[in-house]
From Swiss-Prot:
Any one Gene Ontology cellular component term annotated for this protein: cytoplasm
Organism lineage string: Bacteria, Pseudomonadati, Thermodesulfobacteriota, Desulfobacteria, Desulfobacterales
Function noted in UniProt: Binds 16S rRNA, required for the assembly of 30S particles and may also be responsible for determining the conformation of the 16S rRNA at the A site.
One Pfam family it belongs to: Ribosomal_S14
Identification of the protein by name: Small ribosomal subunit protein uS14
Length: 61
């Protein structure tokens, strides 16, 4: 419940612009957010391994 309320709170426009922070829309995680994809690293990894993100491939060297 706390995570859900924090997600709703993050969607509101704050009094000052610097107070905005990014949250994953899928799981609500505030840390490990990837701006390019708009999701957290854990959701990114799951979606990439399922093939849901076009153009993303697993690297190997």
């Amino acid at each position: 419940m706390a995570r859900k309320s924090l997600c709703v709170k993050a969607q509101r426009t704050p009094k000052f612009k610097v107070r905005t922070y990014n949250r994953c829309p899928l799981c609500g995680r505030p840390r490990g957010y990837m701006r390019k994809f708009g999701i957290c690293r854990i959701c990114f990894r799951n979606m990439a391994s399922e093939g849901l993100l076009p153009g993303v491939i697993k690297s190997s060297w």
